[in-house]
């Protein structure tokens, strides 16, 4: 069975019922346990919620409870991820450190990264399996 890593935007779109996530949202609910997010996405969500840059219609505690109920795992950034991160090329058009951590996590954990960010596609040659939504 395929294993997926949702980036921060994909997860947020799922929670706000964005049409880009309609089919995938059904899959998340059907294939419980095959979807995860990185700890970096969790950190980014905390920041976005605290500073009012994103509205999910729930507080952070409710968000975590929902992740647990959907069996969406949280993957920590370990040495395997750090090794991948250190081998990624320095791309001048993509310097966001959180994105690069998420990409490294997907590669290290052999998960398909789901994102709406077209820039992620440039890492396919580095071992990323990418599903653009």
Q: Can you describe what each PLM-predicted range is?
A:
Residues 91-98:
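Donor nucleotide-sugar recognition loop
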Residues 103, 107-133:
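Acidic, PIN/NYN-like endoribonuclease modules and their adjacent C-terminal/linker elements
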Residues 31-35, 70-73, 108-112:
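Short active-site oxyanion
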Residues 10-11, 41, 81, 102, ...:
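Alpha-helix capping/helix-boundary segments
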Residues 64-91:
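Acidic catalytic patch
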Residues 1-38, 53-65, 133:
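Short, well-structured N-terminal submotif of metal-dependent ribonuclease cores
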């Amino acid at each position: 069975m395929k294993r997926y890593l949702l980036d921060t935007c994909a997860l947020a779109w799922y929670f706000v019922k964005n049409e880009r996530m309609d089919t995938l949202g059904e899959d998340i609910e059907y294939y419980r346990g095959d979807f995860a997010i990185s700890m970096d996405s969790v950190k980014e969500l905390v920041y976005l919620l605290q500073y009012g840059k994103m509205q999910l219609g729930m507080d952070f505690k409710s968000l975590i409870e929902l992740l647990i109920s959907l069996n969406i795992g949280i993957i920590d950034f370990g040495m395997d991820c750090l090794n991948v991160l250190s081998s990624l090329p320095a791309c001048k058009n993509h310097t966001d450190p959180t994105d690069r951590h998420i990409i490294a996590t997907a590669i290290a954990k052999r998960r398909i990264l789901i994102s709406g960010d077209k820039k992620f596609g440039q890492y396919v040659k580095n071992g990323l399996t990418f599903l653009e939504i």
